């Protein structure tokens, strides 16, 4: 099955390059259907997880924990949907002498999972356990993140952590690293969703193999980003991919500022 859907995606790209769009779409459709049949992705679970995060991470929740966590401003998180221009933003930032580019770092999800494991099965799971984190724990988690990511740095005062799915973890990031910068790489719904549908990911992104499901996930992403803007006003810088392509110079200035 893997060989079949890999071939479908490759043929879809080759036909698209030849402007054979009907045939190309049919190859993508078949490849996605084969890949989706192997997965256990549950759209309802994704929706509930994001609703749970939003219900816990309120303005008052963050106000009660103001200036908790590790105060260092070193990380610049690039988040958003896959295929939304995050790599371009990373390249722009990494061209600055004060910023180190890195990899797609798994440390934020891993730390969240580590905390969940510490609590054991008798306690609520993540994110319901976020209110249980005490001030000293948040600082420890922030310092742990900086220590574990140090291996990827080359001496610049700032570094990039580009893991698009971290848009779901902005609340956790703010709790442990309140002075970290966060950039949302955003792209129009049609281009972003179809870009996901055409791409065979090496791992993860299980929402992307069905057009309805990727559209629903994009809506969840936008809703959660709107929530972060409401409860953490000014925390996230939103950069539209189409705007960067149309006017690179002014957007580069905006990003670097």
Predicted regions and their residues:
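PAPS-dependent sulfotransferase catalytic domain
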Residues: 102, 106-134, 150-257
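Alpha-helical solenoid repeat scaffolds of the TPR/TPR-like class and their adjacent stem/linker regions
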Residues: 1-152
């Amino acid at each position: 099955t893997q060989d079949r859907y890999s071939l479908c995606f490759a043929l879809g790209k080759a036909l698209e390059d030849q402007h054979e769009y009907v045939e190309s779409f049919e190859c993508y459709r078949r490849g996605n259907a084969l890949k989706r049949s192997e997965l256990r992705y549950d759209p309802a679970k994704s929706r509930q997880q994001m609703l749970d995060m939003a219900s816990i991470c309120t303005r008052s929740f963050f106000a009660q924990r103001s200036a908790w966590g590790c105060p260092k401003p070193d990380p610049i998180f690039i988040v958003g949907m896959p295929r939304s221009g995050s790599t371009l933003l990373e390249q722009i930032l990494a061209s600055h002498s004060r910023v180190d580019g890195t990899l797609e770092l798994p440390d934020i999800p891993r730390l969240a999972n580590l905390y969940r494991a510490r609590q054991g099965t008798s306690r609520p799971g993540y994110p319901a356990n976020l209110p249980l984190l005490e001030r000293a724990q948040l600082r420890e988690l922030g310092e742990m993140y900086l220590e574990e990511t140090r291996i990827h740095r080359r001496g610049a005062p700032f570094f990039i952590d580009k893991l698009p799915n971290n848009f779901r973890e902005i609340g956790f990031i703010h709790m442990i690293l309140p002075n970290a910068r966060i950039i949302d790489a955003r792209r129009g719904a049609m281009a972003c969703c179809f870009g996901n549908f055409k791409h065979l990911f090496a791992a993860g992104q299980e929402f992307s193999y069905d057009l309805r499901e990727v559209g629903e996930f994009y809506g969840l992403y936008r809703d959660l980003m709107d929530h972060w803007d409401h409860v953490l006003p000014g925390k996230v810088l939103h950069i539209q991919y189409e705007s960067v392509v149309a006017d690179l110079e002014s957007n580069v200035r905006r990003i670097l500022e």
